[in-house]
Amino acid sequence: MAPARAGCCALLLLLLGLWVAEIPVSAKPKDMTSSQWLKTQHMQPSPQACNSAMNNINKYTEQCKDLNTFLHELFSSVATTCQTPNIACKNSRKNCHQSHGPMSLTMCELTSGKYPNCRYKEKHLNAPYIAACDPPQQGDPGYPLVPVHLDKVV
């Protein structure tokens, strides 16, 4: 009887571990719309050092995010990207849009540490980006479409 119980508990712990591992590091907080979360994660009109900027993001998940890109633009500028022609996203949805041209951005890549002591290296560049856009949700600005996901840097 005891070995069967031990096997059951081990299986339960394994399943629990797999379930916890599936929670994405960039999971959107429940009290934010997708657009608000994009603004929190990726909008930074005035560049900041990655180590301090990433602390503001990592506190939501209490994990070190591996990679993050900050766009040094106002939300209104990124929202105008949603007015460019639709293109396919990495996930094959057709709600992505490419920026009008290169934009100033910073890429932060995790180099070491465990939360809350995450350490990042930064890379500054000017490059176009692709963002996914959707109709606004309650609490979003009143644009016809709002950016909800930074799909990639081109």
From Swiss-Prot:
One Pfam family cited in the UniProt record for this chain: RnaseA
Keywords linked to the UniProt accession: Disulfide bond, Endonuclease, Hydrolase, Nuclease, Secreted, Signal
Recorded GO CC terms: extracellular space
Active site: residue positions: 42 (proton acceptor), 149 (proton donor)
Biological process terms in GO annotation: defense response to fungus; defense response to Gram-negative bacterium; defense response to Gram-positive bacterium; innate immune response
Subcellular location: Secreted
Annotated GO MF terms: endonuclease activity; nucleic acid binding; RNA nuclease activity
Isomerase recorded as keyword: no
Disulfide bonds: 64-118, 82-133, 89-96
Function (record text): Has a low ribonuclease activity.
Full protein name: Ribonuclease 8
Source species of the chain: Pongo pygmaeus
Taxonomic lineage of the native organism: Eukaryota, Metazoa, Chordata, Craniata, Vertebrata
This protein's encoding gene: RNASE8
